[in-house]
Amino acid sequence: MDENCQLIPNQIGDHTILFDRKYLQRGIEIYIQNHDICLNLSLPTSMDEIQLFYYLVKVYCEYMDTNEFVKDDWLMDLKDIDLQMVYDKRTSADALMDLKSKLSDHKYFEIFGILHPISIGENELNDFGTDLDLFGQYLHNQQALDAYYATPRIYNAHGRRIGMYALGANILTILPVEPYVVLNQIEGIEEWYVFMNDSLVKYRDLMSFIKKFDYYDANHRMVCLSKEEISEALNTLAIQEI
């Protein structure tokens, strides 16, 4: 994963994400710690991914020639797996219910998918509720779209910290309604910009200028600008210097 929590395909790092290409959902993290093979399953997730997780547990137990594994500091036996799948299913449904109960205090919640973060709000929770199959299908559909998920780069310019997105012509692009850095890893960003055709516009100005968006999630919209639309935007909004 990169600094924006996006998947870097076909690379193995200290922490690597495993997934079934049929299910673009949350993924299963694998890493080595003190000679132990460690797997991490983020909840809530779908039953497909819960089943895949425990399939991998069985595979690695067989590889290590053992019937035992540790989960949440408890020693488990492979015969406990069916019960653990029921537990994780219930925990996932409860987590979705908990998110819905807390929406009055938050605009949305951000969860981490395999390919990139997804913002879950009222619309999303109304669609899938606590149904894990619907939740899993939602995660897959969002990440299977043939679209560019824009992420920011942060720069220091004249003593100020600025954030910058890139937007190209005729590319379906997913942009945040409110620009941000995932997990607030970098704070104190004074201004946000979009880089187009070797020119800069202020982020908020471009978002006001664009006439048509398609909904993506609670904090993202999809846009596809033609060369002519980008030229029109730059003629009106381009700035000479930061």
Feature names for model-found ranges:
Residues Q25-G27, L75, L200:
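Short, solvent-exposed loop/turn motifs
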Residues D2, E62, S104-D105, H140, ...:
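Generic surface-pattern signal
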Residues F19-R21, I32-N34, L41-L43, V70-K71, ...:
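Surface-exposed beta-strand edges and flanking loops
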Residues Y108-I242:
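C-terminal interaction module
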Residues D73-G136:
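Mixed-charge (acidic/basic) macromolecular-recognition segments
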Residues E3-D48:
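Short, intrinsically disordered low-complexity segments
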Residues T45, E49-W74:
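Acidic, low-complexity cytosolic segments
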Residues I28-I32, L78-L83, F195:
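Short amphipathic beta-strand/extended segments with alternating polar/hydrophobic composition
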